[in-house]
Every structure is written in structure tokens, then in C-alpha cells.
Amino acid sequence: MRDLQQLLDELKDMSFFNPGEMCIIGCSTSEVIGKRIGSVGSMDVAKEIYENLKQLEIDTGVTFAFQGCEHINRAVTIERANFNPLTMEEVTVVPDVHAGGSLSTYAYQQMEDPIVVEHITVSKGIDIGQTLIGMHIKHVCVPVRTSVKQIGEAIVTIATSRPKKIGGERAKYQ
């Protein structure tokens, strides 16, 4: 999947991935192969994407969280070691290709000790196929522009965040 590797290399060169940070991944493998979101799914595509992301975790120290589909309320699969009971609520569900999506299903199967949480707040994310990851990105969400606009047939959107600017016209920010 040349598009994916090109995107990840470009983001890596931009220092998008930082050690200890968590990045949310939303992915419609159906969209990647040119079908309507949620229609067919592909564990083969999920495996290829996951393995590329896993290598990036090793290379950069970033951690990935995997958003499920709307059938599980876009719940997020993470390693239990990253679970914070003060800011996250565990839910009882095991992602499945038809209720959770192929990538979150594959991630759940590959993780050492997976847990699914209802909601997470992270500073950045990659959305492959318009899966609507924005609900898991800190305010204020900011788009990141790259030369890669699609992974396969899926539109890709990258987001980061910045702190809110508060205080009105008299406030100073620098």
C-alpha cells in the first residue's frame, strides 16, 4: 500500500508523531477498496494498515488508538496499558468486522491486552475514509495538509490540535 507508506513517511518527516503521544486512527477498509463505507470490509487491508502503523509505533514511540464504526458508537480500541480510568470508560464489546470495522477488529486481535473505551481525547489523528474521528480530537482541531489525499480509494484527512485561545481581544498569546 504505497499511498499509506508515503503518507506515514511524510508525517514522520513533519515530526507529526511524538514519543508517548496517542494518535487516533479511523479507517474504512471498504472505502480503501473503493466501496461504500461499512459495506464490505477487508481484513487483508486492515492487516496491511495495522502492520505499517505497528512499525511506526516501534520507530517513533507514538501509540495508536483504533476507532470502531458507528455500530459500536465509534468506541476506541487501545492497549490496556494506555487505559486511564480517570479519563476513560471501559465498555463491553469486542469489535467485529460488521460491528466495529475491520481495522479495529484486527487491532483488537493483535494487541497484547486490548480494551475498548467509549471515548478518548487525543491531540491528533488520521481518518482514512471519512470515519469522523473528530469526536476524539482535543479542541481546537486543526487540519494537517499533506501531498497524499487518498489511501487506495479512500479520502484521507489528518488532524492535530492546538490549545484554545481565550480571553478576548485584550488577551496576549505570546
UniProtKB/Swiss-Prot annotation:
Pfam family, one: DUF436
Superkingdom of this protein's organism: Bacteria
Name by which UniProt lists this protein: UPF0340 protein SE_1711
SUPFAM superfamilies the record matches: TTHA0583/YokD-like (SSF110710)
InterPro entries the UniProt entry points to: Antibiotic_NAT-like, DUF436
Family: Belongs to the UPF0340 family.
